[in-house]
């Protein structure tokens, strides 16, 4: 898939996901990131995990069984189709993973905005990129090669 095809696929994906309700196991932030990987890199983890868990702990168990990982950071570090880059080099389509206290959250970089699963609105939505906030947290940025 060339860069133009990736951008078109990403635009279609954002259009599909934006404003969907937030549902753990379907449209939580990790599932959104896995859906991006499915469309841009052909990784099938999204299909294997979709609607298979209702809690984050359940998601970790199912992911360990189906994909061999229980933490998305560990999984992304092992995928040959991803390369880790600095936040300063992030561009459209990159996945930013932020380490929270008990889990990792993912947002999809879209230039001046990010696609994110919001606990506040219970929807998938576009939000402003706050680089200072991201830099203040433990994070990694991944790009599909």
Tell me the role of every PLM-derived stretch.
Residues 1-13, 116-129:
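Long hydrophobic alpha-helices with heptad-repeat/coiled-coil character
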Residues 57-125:
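...with weaker cross-activation on analogous glycine-rich loops/strands in unrelated enzymes
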Residues 24, 55-58, 71, 111, ...:
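Intrinsically disordered, low-complexity regions enriched in small/polar residues
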Residues 126-145:
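Glycine- and charge-enriched low-complexity intrinsically disordered segments
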């Amino acid at each position: 898939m060339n860069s133009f095809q990736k951008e078109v696929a990403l635009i279609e994906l954002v259009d599909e996901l934006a404003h969907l309700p937030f549902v753990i196991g379907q449209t939580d932030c990790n599932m959104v990131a896995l859906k991006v990987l499915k469309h841009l890199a052909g990784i099938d983890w999204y299909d294997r995990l979709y609607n298979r868990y209702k809690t984050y702990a359940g998601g970790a168990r199912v992911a360990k069984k189906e994909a061999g990982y229980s933490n998305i950071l560990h999984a992304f570090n092992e995928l040959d189709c991803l390369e880790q880059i600095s936040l300063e080099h992030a561009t459209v389509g990159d996945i930013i993973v932020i380490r929270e206290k008990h889990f990792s959250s993912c947002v999809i970089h879209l230039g001046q905005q990010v696609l994110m699963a919001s606990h506040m609105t219970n929807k998938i939505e576009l939000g402003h990129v706050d680089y200072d906030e991201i830099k203040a947290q433990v994070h990694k940025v991944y790009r599909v090669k």
